[in-house]
Amino acid sequence: MMTDSMRLVWEKAKEAIRSQVPDQGYLMWIDPLRVVKAAADSVVLGCPNPLAKKWLMDHYRGLLESAMQQAAQRPLKVLLEVAECVAEAPETPEEAPQQLCLPAFADIPRPSSGRLLNRDFTFDSFVVGDCNDFAYSAALSVASKRSKLHAPLYLLAQTGLGKSHLSQAVGRQVMQESPEERVFYITAEDFTNEMIGALNTGTISSFKEKYRRNCDTLILEDVHFLSGKNRTQDELAFTLDSLMETNKRLVFTSAYLPSEIPKMHDSMRSRLNAGVISSLEAPDFRMRMRILQRKANSAKIALPMDVAEFMASELTGDIRHLESGIKGLAARNSIMGRGIDLKMAREVVGNIVRNRKALTLGVITKMVCKYYRVTEEDLRSRSRKQAIARPRQVAMYLGRRYTDQSLQAIGRTFNRYHATALHAVGVVERHIRENGDMREPVLFLCGKIEAGEF
């Protein structure tokens, strides 16, 4: 039967997933899932409860679909429903449960090299306002087939303000308008690791050919990771020269201006400065209102005007705080069956901003030490053991995200340089993006901070 064969596919997919998520996360969220329904182009995975379903939707949606499609070797829609008792089910679903990924696999543009693009990051879904309209227009111009803008685009913004959204929107637009063009979407760390691998295996000529001759659009995230990477900077500089000479599209993202990135060669810095540098600022009140309404529509909840105004007034940080607010409302609305009103909004916002002013780097350090069972002296030591280095990196990341401390100040707190703190932030951000083994501890600590539990 179709369901039986799909169960074999699911077992194969689980093996692939297991290698990409921490053991604790796999046992808690992935292993309990069962195939309950299947059709030729879709599969329904049963979750034990609504909380598990919501967590999977928020954290593992892309990984589940990608693994199933690779295991089945065909386009598949992956759907979730709560099914405490898994029994034999009809092959064709009688009622469509909540869909995990809307378009079929074949309809998802895939870069020629590098990472998959987020399906939600399109120009249409980007909320435009005074804080980002130039960046939006510049990105749209770069992506257009009729663009006269041949200079590189450098998107500058702090975490959570939309630079990755725009960079990936460029990639999606290019692939949709010009499927024959080769789009490479990678991080600076990916480029570094690939280059090191090529050097170690004696394939550096193929590596150079790939990026200099077989690339039409290069989207390079987190260029600040290049700090102190002399060999990588040299190789990338030659690559950029080759691409710019042939008017290829170049998009860079960073939280820092080229002039602010330490240990960067002048030659590399000049190439990054050669294009259009466009910043994305924090949204103002009207912009936050629009974002909240857009997020509420996506979450399929009705957001009363007084609730939207209250949340827009209180959640003045990055856009992720607004997303957290909408998710909090949606969860309470769904699980508790309560209507969305100001009382609920105050509860949700309170969990996000409670005691924010009291949060210091010292408090964060104590939280991290308690979680990882290390001492503050350990974090300030010169030890590079993973059991010490990982917690230190997490503390630096949380300090950068939740306090107004500079990278220099954060580095000094742990007896490290500015560049080391910058590297730590980049490492943790990568683990969060890629479901690395630091992801769940970091998200847990973020949740504690945003709930005021520190």
Swiss-Prot record:
Keywords: ATP-binding, Cytoplasm, DNA replication, DNA-binding, Lipid-binding, Nucleotide-binding
Pfam family, one: Bac_DnaA_C
Sections of the chain in a coiled coil: none
Residue span of region Domain I, interacts with DnaA modulators: 1-83
Cellular component aspect of the GO annotation: cytoplasm; plasma membrane
Superkingdom of source: Bacteria
Chain segments carrying region Domain III, AAA+ region: 116-333
NCBIfam families in UniProt: DnaA (TIGR00362)
Record family assignment: Belongs to the DnaA family.
Chain's role: Plays an essential role in the initiation and regulation of chromosomal replication. ATP-DnaA binds to the origin of replication (oriC) to initiate formation of the DNA replication initiation complex once per cell cycle. Binds the DnaA box (a 9 base pair repeat at the origin) and separates the double-stranded (ds)DNA. Forms a right-handed helical filament on oriC DNA; dsDNA binds to the exterior of the filament while single-stranded (ss)DNA is stabiized in the filament's interior.
Subunit structure: Oligomerizes as a right-handed, spiral filament on DNA at oriC.
Annotated protein name in UniProt: Chromosomal replication initiator protein DnaA
Source lineage: Bacteria, Pseudomonadati, Thermodesulfobacteriota, Desulfobacteria, Desulfobacterales
